[in-house]
Regions:
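Domain-level signal for Mg2+-assisted phosphodiester chemistry and nucleotide/NA-binding surfaces
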Residues: 1-114, 118-120
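Acidic, metal-associated active-site segment
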Residues: 121-128
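Short, surface-exposed connector motifs at secondary-structure boundaries
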Residues: 129-134
Length: 134
């Protein structure tokens, strides 16, 4: 079996990839297949599963959904990539101000948006794929 490449599936949490590696850089359009070839040169990557959620427009960035959709359409053209969607959940929470103004409440209400489903989807796909020997 010398020289045989290991058959490999890659599972990517898009939220963690973005905030851990891409946010604050000029890089946005990451070629997932090239990334896998770079980090796994001795493996045969047969599947890349990309776990994400569709973003909503924000007052400070109304074009964010269009940019995300363009990227998702692009990576869908890669033969090994499949996209699995979770969702975002927004709700009002109370948060403490970092520098409260004296004489005013140190608390404000904010809208907190959290990604839901990607972690569970990723774990479920990973276990199922291992079970069926993907």
């Amino acid at each position: 079996m010398a020289g045989a490449q290991l058959r490999t599936s890659v599972y990517i949490d898009a939220f963690n990839l973005y905030f851990g590696s891409l946010k604050g850089t000029p890089h946005r359009w990451l070629d997932l297949e090239a990334l896998c070839r770079t980090y796994l040169p001795k493996n045969s990557v047969t599947a890349i599963k990309y776990f994400t959620a569709k973003v909503s427009a924000r007052p400070n960035d109304p074009q964010q959904p269009a940019r995300q959709q363009a990227y998702l359409r692009a990576i869908e053209t890669l033969p090994t990539v499949s996209i699995i969607y979770g969702h975002y959940l927004s709700h009002v929470v109370t948060a403490r101000l970092a520098t409260p103004v004296q004489g005013q409440s140190p608390y404000v209400q904010i809208i907190k948006t959290e990604e839901k489903g990607a972690d569970v989807n990723l774990a479920t796909h990973l276990l199922n794929d291992a079970h069926v020997n993907l």
